Design a protein with these regions (language model features):
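Carbohydrate-active catalytic/glycan-binding domains of CAZyme proteins
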Residues: 20-329
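Bacterial Sec-dependent N-terminal signal peptides
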Residues: 1-22
Length: 329
């Protein structure tokens, strides 16, 4: 769930880029690179945007939406244009920006999508065209939450959307050819879940705390990074990042010990220490031959301000990821 969070950041190994990058205030960062410039999109009013040529020095750009998309009030009454957890995806020279509209701690939610031919706001062709709802969840109807989208293209060219938060786990759904709707007939898979107490009402997010799947192709596998446990609880936060993998985009995903993510499996990648109130909602990319993980972490020494973190991934002999040497202090 993507409102301001006081998360707990992990004791982990990583190269963290310059202080300029660390000082950027973000939630749920995703990134695309076009013509030598990195464009970062994150949770914020109208979807916040930053640009950089070096992953260190960032320029704030105008938000994607100066006014809320027209359809949002149909999902969330009196929606304030605070849009959560975007994902940016490029195919056939078109950029697709998926985003989340929701009420905190409810599955009154929908994922929308907008398209653009360029990410450069100075390009005369720069214009975000909104296409409305891709998928919507409704309380007492659905046991899943339509937020936290992530797009992945399979080996056969089929595009899938992973998404979800709490309830009965994280989902993967096949997209139609224009990537603005779910394919018909619908094809759904559950790609991660944790045990949920049967005593809770269906409208309750539940105690199976997981969200924000991000799928990444590497080494002949699809890796699923996801966030576990609780944010938003100050120094009691337990938010962390775990990972699993599969040979098939639809799963089953398993952790390093072979436990399925659908049965609560997950290999720990990032967890907290006394200096950071959590890390989560990561994205993972290959830029210029190097693999990077982007995420936000809350600074215990700066009143819990959420900071952008970027680390380089490394891979062991069994092709499992960890973060590069060095400990975040």
């Amino acid at each position: 769930m993507k409102l301001p969070k006081t998360l707990l950041f992990g004791f982990f190994f990583g190269i963290i880029f310059s202080s300029a990058a660390q000082e950027i205030i973000v939630h749920d960062p995703v990134v695309a690179k076009q013509d030598g410039t990195y464009y970062l999109f994150n949770t914020g009013h109208g979807i916040s945007v930053h640009s950089s040529t070096d992953l260190e020095n960032w320029k704030q750009e105008e938000p994607v939406f100066s006014e809320k998309p027209e359809w949002t009030d149909e999902v969330v009454a009196d929606f304030k244009n605070h849009i959560w957890a975007p994902d940016i995806f490029e195919k056939d020279e078109t950029y697709y920006l998926y985003y989340s509209v929701s009420s905190f701690a409810k599955n009154t939610s929908a994922i929308g999508v907008a398209t653009n031919s360029t990410l450069n706001p100075n390009d005369p062709h720069y214009n975000w065209q909104d296409h409305g709802i891709v998928v919507q969840s409704v309380p007492n109807r659905d046991m899943w939450n339509a937020i936290d989208p992530n797009m992945i293209e399979g080996e056969d060219g089929t595009v899938w959307m992973a998404f979800g938060s709490f309830w009965d786990g994280l989902k993967l759904v096949k997209m139609d050819d224009d990537l603005t709707k779910i394919a018909e007939p619908e094809v759904w898979h559950t790609i991660a879940r944790r045990e949920r107490s049967f005593k809770l009402p269906d409208t309750d997010p539940g105690d199976a705390a997981l969200e924000a799947p991000f799928l990444f192709k590497k080494n002949g596998y699809y890796y699923q990074f996801l966030s576990w446990d609780l944010c938003c609880r100050g120094d009691q936060s337990t938010y962390k990042v775990v990972v699993g993998r599969s040979k098939d985009v639809t799963g089953p995903y398993v952790d390093k010990e072979g436990k399925p993510l659908n049965e609560g499996g997950g290999t720990l990648l990032i967890e907290g220490n006394e200096n950071w109130y959590g890390a989560g909602h990561n994205s993972t990319y290959t830029f210029d031959g190097k693999d990077y993980i982007f995420f936000h972490a809350y600074d215990a020494n700066d009143k819990g301000a959420p900071k952008l973190k970027i680390a380089e991934l490394k891979w062991d002999e069994e092709q499992w990821p960890s973060l590069k040497e060095g400990v975040l202090k």
